[in-house]
Design a protein with these regions (language model features):
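Conserved beta-strand/loop scaffold segments within soluble protein domains that form the structured core
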Residues: 13, 24-28, 39-42, 123-124, ...
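Small/polar glycine-rich anion-binding or flexible loop at a beta-alpha turn
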Residues: 386, 407-413
Length: 438
């Protein structure tokens, strides 16, 4: 008689376990079914790209290296342009993906940070599946769908996993790089970044192509999760070739009292890029800051914006954009703030300089308020360089071309307050390097 309750409890447990396994299977199946339905779905904004024009590189076709010093001299130079130090000085970890191969990971520099490729991370942590395709949906458009279906077909997820452990504050940044070394390749990556409770994480990501690459495509899906009291600074530098198509897909989920700072820099020519990272401020007193520098050159089409959805009391967001259009470039500078509850604040600022009669900037500031007692504001201004400023500098013996360059560089300078002193200096160096030639 005494065994029946035990057997009954065991049967209930087995049924619950069976249901959980079934739900996991259905969840995975739904991801891929959603992706299959969206494989031809155009993105809501931006130029439509025919992804069939690009080839799927075999995963892990390139051998791993033991040290970043094993890279060629030219590749090291290309990486340095996007903030990746092959000597790993003042870094807490490193990750390098070339085409579809993770060729280097260094997880041994800091005790506070975990860095690994997604395939290894998924094997180590069963709970990581819960973070995949959560804030970025597989059916958002054909680019996310393609990334999800490649994961299914190849059975391996490309991209990086970075996690700061609870209560730790690592000052030195992790560096991660997505590098394209072959023409006509479509590179995909699915990255997960987690800042555990009361931790601090700094991440520098550089994306670039080899010196001899003409055409290629990059799709990077990044999902970031900030637990209560945590902070992430995410600095991204892009240096693409002129015929590369770029489609980052990024979303961030913020818990109570967390802070997310995003710095984005693009000053090299590109075919087209369309990116609209979204921060969901779901926690009380959470804060999201987006700052971007966009330098349009040649016939680049740049469609870059930032969005913050303020869903919790005390949440704040700032979106600041600086854009300069040269040659025949086109820049669409977007910003979107949505306040859904009382006592939230948001500010959007978009400024642009048009330096050529054949270029243009289209500023799209959006404010959305669906609650009372909130503060939302925006500033937008697009124009040319002031003649008075040029005359002031030339009157002091500075050549006109150099004077114009100085004004543009000053206009594009980014406020890097909020970063640790050591990281602030490194970030400023990256900005200065990116603005070389502007």
């Amino acid at each position: 008689m005494g065994q029946f309750p035990v057997q009954e409890t065991l049967m209930k447990f087995l049924k619950i376990l069976e249901k959980m396994v079934l739900m996991d299977v259905l969840s995975v199946r739904n991801v891929y079914e959603d992706a299959e339905r969206a494989i031809n779905k155009k993105a809501a904004i931006g130029a439509d790209i025919t992804i069939e024009n690009f080839t799927d590189e075999t995963i892990n076709a390139i051998d791993m290296i033991d040290d970043l010093d094993d890279l060629s001299k030219q590749t090291k130079k290309d990486l340095l342009k996007v903030g990746v130090d092959t000597n790993e000085e003042n870094r807490s970890g490193s990750f390098l993906q070339v085409d579809q191969s993770n060729i280097f990971t260094n997880n041994s520099i800091s005790d506070s940070i975990e860095v690994m490729n997604m395939g290894v991370a998924l094997e180590k942590y069963s709970w990581l599946e819960d973070y995949m395709w959560n804030v970025v949906k597989p059916d958002a458009d054909k680019y996310t769908a393609k990334t999800a279906l490649r994961e299914k077909e190849e059975g391996v997820t490309s991209g990086y996993f970075v996690r700061s452990l609870p209560g730790t504050k690592e000052v030195m940044p992790v560096q991660a790089c997505m590098f394209i070394s072959d023409t006509d390749v479509m590179q995909t990556a699915h990255n997960i970044v987690i800042a555990e409770e009361n931790s601090e994480l700094h991440l520098i990501t550089g994306c670039a192509t080899g010196d001899d690459i003409s055409s290629a495509m990059h799709v990077g899906v990044s999902e970031m999760y900030l637990k209560p009291g945590s902070k992430i600074t995410f600095t991204m530098v892009h240096n693409w070739a002129e015929e590369v198509e770029v489609r980052p897909r990024t979303a961030i989920k913020l818990a109570d009292n967390s802070t997310y700072i995003n710095n984005y820099i693009l000053t090299s020519p590109v075919s087209t890029i369309q990116s609209f990272p979204t921060a969901y401020c779901d926690g009380k007193n959470s804060r999201a800051i987006f700052q971007s520098i966009q330098g349009g050159k040649k016939d680049s089409i740049i469609d870059v914006g930032s969005r913050a959805i303020l869903n919790a009391e005390g949440a704040k967001a700032e979106v600041i954009s600086r854009a300069v259009a040269q040659d025949e470039s086109q820049i669409f500078a977007r910003g979107h703030l949505a306040g859904n509850v009382p006592n939230v604040k948001g500010h959007l600022e978009c400024q642009g300089l048009v330096l050529s009669d054949d270029s243009f900037i289209y500023a799209v500031p959006e404010l959305e308020a669906s609650s009372t007692n909130l503060e939302m504001s925006h500033e937008a201004a697009v124009g040319k360089i002031s003649e008075d400023e040029i005359n002031y500098l030339t009157s002091r013996g500075i050549p006109e071309e150099e004077a114009e360059s100085m004004i543009v560089r000053g206009f594009l300078n980014m406020d890097i307050t909020g970063l640790p002193e050591e990281l602030a200096q490194q970030t400023q160096n990256m900005i200065d390097m990116s603005l070389d030639g502007i």
